[in-house]
């Protein structure tokens, strides 16, 4: 991890922590050249080796490269994409793309988005029936 090069997202932890409380899992800023783990909860950190963290950051960087394409397809109707949301069994990740290879990832425990996830659960249940 390169801590000498500033990556975006330093203030996000202080902004999000009061409302997220113990459900905040991580805040990571990344650029094409470096990344900074601004916050990672101890139990989450225990599950990640340095190699796994680097692999996850690389995946986030790759995801930024599709931003222009997504905006060109959906932008005229929906406006530009502001944030990508990935829902996992135990976590919700928000990825805010700032430019190619640059962004901020904020992860929460899945329970953090319980109200919003109800719609997703209903859709998943319907698709399982199909």
Report each predicted region and the residues it spans.
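Non-catalytic interaction/Regulatory regions outside core domains
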Residues: 1-130
């Amino acid at each position: 991890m390169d801590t000498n090069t500033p990556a975006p997202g330093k203030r996000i932890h202080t902004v999000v922590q009061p409302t997220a409380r113990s459900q905040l899992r991580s805040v990571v800023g990344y650029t094409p050249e470096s990344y900074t783990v601004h916050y990672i909860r101890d139990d989450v950190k225990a599950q990640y080796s340095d190699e796994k963290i680097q692999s996850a950051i690389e995946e986030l960087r790759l995801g930024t490269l599709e931003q222009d394409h997504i905006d060109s397809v959906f932008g005229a109707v929906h406006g530009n994409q502001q944030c990508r949301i990935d829902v996992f069994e135990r976590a919700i990740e928000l990825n805010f793309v700032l430019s190619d290879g640059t962004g901020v990832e904020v992860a929460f425990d899945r329970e953090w988005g319980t109200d919003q996830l109800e719609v997703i659960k209903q859709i998943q249940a319907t698709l399982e029936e199909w």
